[in-house]
Design a protein with these regions (language model features):
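Short, intrinsically disordered terminal tails adjacent to the first/last structured region
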Residues: 1-25
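Membrane-interfacial loop-to-transmembrane-helix junctions in polytopic alpha-helical membrane proteins
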Residues: 20-23, 27, 91-98, 140-143
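Transmembrane signal-anchor helices characteristic of membrane glycosylation enzymes that use polyprenol
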Residues: 24-52
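Aromatic- and kink-enriched transmembrane "portal" helix at the membrane-lumen/periplasm boundary
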Residues: 39-45, 82, 96, 107-113, ...
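Transmembrane helix-loop junctions in multipass membrane proteins, especially transporters and channels
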Residues: 44-51, 55, 90, 94, ...
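Short hydrophobic/aromatic helix or loop-helix immediately within or flanking a transmembrane segment
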Residues: 56-59, 67, 71-101, 105
Length: 146
């Protein structure tokens, strides 16, 4: 068998595996894609508030030691959000791009877990991602949750 035939067979096998996985999960993939589109679009028009900027400034200006040991006492919530924002903030990524991209990644992961890893009834899995809290409060606003 030539290497071209083996490569074509490998590609066909991969495509069959993807098609086999996608068939029962088609609705969940559509819901996830729609969620990312809706939240991404609304994020473009959302103006961050002072508390969203506060987290970015803490991530940008504090040392790791201060971020983990000192700031939680004053801010009242755990430092995980600042730690996730620290890499783009300290690398000089623009404020809104860095903040919103990290938040969109977290929100997408949340909906992926909801769609593919929970045993909720199908109607809940379709409707729940577009509820006020999951779509706007947790998806669009970039605030640490207490």
């Amino acid at each position: 068998m030539s290497s071209a035939t083996v490569a074509a067979t490998d590609n066909r096998t991969r495509c069959d595996a993807i098609r086999h996985w996608l068939t029962p999960h088609r609705l969940h993939c559509i819901v996830l894609a729609a969620y990312v589109i809706v939240v991404g679009t609304v994020m473009c028009f959302h103006e961050p508030w002072f508390d969203e900027a506060q987290a970015w400034l803490i991530a940008r200006d504090c040392s790791w030691r201060e971020m983990i040991l000192e700031r939680p006492h004053y801010e009242g919530h755990p430092p995980l959000w600042w730690m996730m924002l620290a890499a783009p903030a300290k690398l000089g990524v623009p404020y809104e791009i860095g903040l919103k991209s990290i938040n969109l990644t977290c929100a997408t992961l949340m909906i992926w877990l909801l769609e593919f890893k929970t045993k909720l009834p199908e109607p809940f899995k379709v409707i729940l991602p577009f509820s006020y809290f999951l779509c706007y409060q947790y998806g669009v606003t970039s605030r640490p949750m207490r």
